[in-house]
Amino acid sequence: MSAVFDASAFLATCSNRPGVYRMFDADAKLLYVGKAKSLKKRLASYFRKSGLAPKTAALVARIAQVETTITANETEALLLEQTLIKEWRPPYNILLRDDKSYPFVFLSSEDEYPRLSLHRGAKKRKGRYFGPYPSAGAIRESLNLLQKAFLVRQCEDSYFRNRTRPCLQYQIKRCKGPCVGLVSPEEYAEDVRHSVMFLEGRSNALADELNVGMEQAAMRLDFEKAAELRDQVAILRRVQDQQSMEGGNGDVDIVAAIVTPGGACVHLISVRGGRVLGSKNFFPQVAIEEEVGEVLLAFLGQYYLSHQERDLPAELIVNVTHEDFPVLVSAIAEARGRELEISYRVRGTRARWQQLAVTNAEQALGARLANRQHVAARFEALAEALDLAEPPQRLECFDISHSSGEATVASCVVFGPEGPLKSDYRRYNIEGVTAGDDYAAMHQALTRRFSRLKDGEGKMPDILLVDGGKGQLAMAQEVLQELAVAGLILLGVAKGVTRKPGLETLYLNDASHEFTLPADSPALHLIQQIRDEAHRFAITGHRARRGKARRTSTLEDVPGVGPKRRRDLLKHFGGLQELSRASIDELAKAPGISKKLAEQIYAVLHSE
């Protein structure tokens, strides 16, 4: 029992009514938020003299203050609890990683030839959003299928607008070539309509419609069209066999939770319109001993109550039950305006799906724990290689990515003994440096990172790993000296002459200590892993930034030149490069271009 908290005096005045309680430490830091049918009974269970699990006892030992809020009923208590957990993320609560955006399939509506794409973030563009999906992988699978079946374009708008001949997707029959007018807007619109039917889960109606169209095409002796529709039906049937859930066309989420001494995993399978959209593993943070039912209840509350944009199914199939599920159903109905059913005892196909979710959760948790042990062993090997008294707890690695100085991005990735700490990853858009100057880019990124540390933001790494050898290591040391940052180890890594993995040269601190590690060294494998992850994270950020900069064609800056006229101009001159070389008189000879408009186009193309 806490020495600084008088539990007896507190419990003597505690209410027996439903409500929410908040536990604080001596520094007024919120440790834990909970709800209870009876506040007094629930809180008394924490302060009994024996029988507490070790992690729960550790929580109780830190309690210096408890605050309670009485609610009208358990439903209000659950809603308030979820609000507080989302806002404060107390360290002893069961917490999900806070996904800030969810993936959707986006169909543009402003284009003559609409595009299908994966979308995250704010819904600013006009069009239809299908989802959210459980993972980006599930969306890519659907997009790949739609591209095979209906050939709706998925290329970037800038790429689409500047084509003068069909791309490879047309050659391999994944696109009908709308960029160069090889398909009419009417035929393309029909393909888009069929794609929408599929995304809406109306696969059976779509298959019926395609079958009718196939028969009609055959009667007209249009065997090419009939064969195309036949292939589309075959793809649909194959998908239905692979992704359908027998027993109806309902919207169901199958959720299974597994808890072991090493951690917890929740596996979710999402079914909409009888079609499996995909699945995802979640690894909630569990700081105190919890039964599997408590973990599942906490997951469902955070997953469906904390994010209103998530699609709500009609039914949940779960692998364990909990006495508070009726309260959860009531809370979801109040917050979302819709009721759902939670099923535990299911039979037949539904039971097989339930078991599949359990199996996936078990396998995912087992793989995660094995990887955690693997990474921890590598951290111990690194400590031995660097002659450290104990393994480091936080490694940060920086890398730079650009294309000939364009759209320079620096990345910072973070690893701990349990693996990548992706919520701590950061990217830095580099500005104001000479194009291609990696040293200046590294100086700017490190200055921004460690200036924030000096201001009390973020955590100090034990080891700072810099990809680039002596030069970048010297730059990192210069930044740390400028900011008076001390107490960390600097480690530079340079590729060998052949640039093959296993031949890296390592430099410690001021580069006075140069050494190598055996190719089979676990310590070297850890260094390679974090370096490669930093490179991956930098290059994906660079490509996104470069793509955004290139997405707008120069011609889009010309008033009066819309998508059709841009396409006609590019087709007339054979591409943007040839168009840029044209004189005003040559531009004015293009169909639909007046002398005044030609002058405007020329001015924009030669503004630099």
Curated annotation (Swiss-Prot):
GIY-YIG domain location: 16-94
A cellular component annotation (GO) from this entry: excinuclease repair complex
UVR domain mapped to chain residues: 204-239
Gene3D superfamilies xref list: 5' to 3' exonuclease, C-terminal subdomain, GIY-YIG endonuclease, UVR domain, UvrC, RNAse H endonuclease domain
Keywords of this entry: Cytoplasm, DNA damage, DNA excision, DNA repair, Excision nuclease, SOS response
Cell location: Cytoplasm
One Pfam family of this chain: UvrC_RNaseH
GO molecular function annotation: DNA binding; excinuclease ABC activity
GO biological process: nucleotide-excision repair; SOS response
Major localisation: cytoplasm
Quaternary structure, from the entry: Interacts with UvrB in an incision complex.
Function text: The UvrABC repair system catalyzes the recognition and processing of DNA lesions. UvrC both incises the 5' and 3' sides of the lesion. The N-terminal half is responsible for the 3' incision and the C-terminal half is responsible for the 5' incision.
PANTHER family: UVRABC SYSTEM PROTEIN C (PTHR30562:SF1), UVRC/OXIDOREDUCTASE (PTHR30562)
Similarity annotation: Belongs to the UvrC family.
Protein name (database record): UvrABC system protein C
Organism: Pseudomonas aeruginosa (strain LESB58)
